[in-house]
Amino acid sequence: MKSLILIFSLALMTVSCGSQIYLEPTTLNSVVEKKEFDFNATKAFPTNYDVINVMNSMPGSTGTRILNLDPGYGFNLKKDLFSVALPYFGRAFSATPGDANNGGIRFESKDFRIKQSTTKKGNTLFVITTVDQRESYVFNLEIFKNGSAFLSVSSNNRQPISFDGNLSAAK
């Protein structure tokens, strides 16, 4: 019975989230065509079970694997600059020297590759690969027709992490 209620709740949340429009279709088509937009992350989905166990052990935890994020996280994509400021919850495979206070995935790249395709459902898929960073990153961004988006970030030094969010016109 609990699993039936859980499935019904997830289906209801999916339907209610899918009907909200984050960016008008004409604006969405324009920013996707120009490849100049902002991705605003609203939720993080860590894959590391150590992080999930810590989250579940905290007082008031609901046993979820989703972290709601404060505004200000995401990335800005322009023709000549890819600026990223995302939190990171997970394990790095090797220690990298740098500022310990500058956690997360934060960098600016001027040398990056973009591959654009369309999924079977008609969504746009961007694969953005950095070239000029010490740690190579691959960003898989699926953009839905209502302006919402799902981002998966993988690296040669960290466990993957995913984010849910929406697009806006580049500032």
Residue ranges of predicted features:
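Post-signal-peptide N-terminal segment of Sec-exported extracytoplasmic proteins
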Residues: 38-68
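Mid-length scaffold segments of soluble, non-membrane domains
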Residues: 69-118
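Post-signal peptide N-terminal segment of mature Sec-exported envelope proteins
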Residues: 26-44
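Bacterial signal peptide processing site
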Residues: 18-21
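C-terminal motif of bacterial Sec signal peptides marking the signal peptidase cleavage site
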Residues: 13-16
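Helix-rich interaction surfaces within compact, conserved domain-sized segments
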Residues: 23-32, 110-171
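Structural motif
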Residues: 36, 81-83, 148
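Positively charged n-region of N-terminal signal peptides that target proteins for export
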Residues: 1-4
